[in-house]
């Protein structure tokens, strides 16, 4: 870290520390040791970067440990900079992390799960490959307004996946990405309206439940 800070100081002095067309984030590490993470966050906060990420908590650690590390580190993150949780996660993970002060996320989960038929809905997660959807003419999620839910049935999408048709994966990925984008939109609206706590309590477990 000392070498990194020294190099950052040198680059800033030379006026070429950051590409002006991109953002530079400091990434907080420290495994599951809160004292190391807090000390590391304090030091990288001094670099005055565009944002700060919490890394190394989505590679097998228990979710409760992840939440605890976020709670420990967040008070030491600059209040006016983006807070980014790397590699997370399920809708429930996102809601819990937002409740702890996180702004930004990235994860392969919505697209990877979609390719295997695991689809997010506002009632929970469905496995569209299950036999019970073979003749189900309803959309993936009646509460969803994505192009997939407006135009295709569960039965048809299941048929595509079972037949290994590429269109099936395209449609399921489109749906899950739409769901995640709408989830983040809902979270922003609930925060603006001051109703996020009620939203959290209603959906944090429901959205990760398999139905």
Regions found by a protein language model. Name each.
Residues 141-211:
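C-terminal extensions of enzymes
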Residues 7, 11, 15, 19-140:
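Glycine-rich phosphate/ribose-binding loops and adjacent secondary-structure elements
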Residues 1, 5:
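Carboxylate/His-rich catalytic cores and anion/metal-binding grooves
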């Amino acid at each position: 870290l000392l070498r990194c800070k020294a190099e950052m100081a040198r680059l800033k002095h030379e006026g070429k520390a950051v590409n002006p067309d991109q953002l530079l984030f400091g990434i907080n590490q420290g495994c599951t040791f809160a004292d190391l993470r807090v000390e590391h966050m304090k030091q990288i906060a001094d670099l005055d970067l565009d944002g700060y990420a919490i890394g190394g908590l989505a590679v097998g650690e228990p979710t409760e440990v992840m939440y605890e590390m976020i709670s420990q580190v967040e008070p030491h993150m600059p209040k006016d900079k983006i807070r980014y949780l790397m590699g997370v996660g399920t809708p429930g993970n996102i809601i819990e992390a937002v409740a702890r002060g996180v702004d930004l996320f990235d994860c392969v989960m919505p697209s990877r799960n979609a390719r295997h038929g695991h689809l997010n809905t506002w009632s929970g997660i469905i496995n569209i490959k299950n036999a019970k959807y073979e003749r189900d003419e309803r959309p993936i999620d009646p509460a969803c307004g994505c192009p997939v839910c407006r135009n295709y049935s569960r039965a048809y999408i299941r048929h595509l996946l079972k037949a290994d048709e590429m269109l099936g994966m395209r449609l399921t990925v489109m749906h899950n990405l739409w769901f995640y984008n709408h989830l983040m939109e809902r979270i922003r609206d609930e925060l603006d309206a001051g109703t996020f706590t009620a939203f959290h309590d209603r959906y944090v477990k429901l959205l990760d439940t398999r139905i």
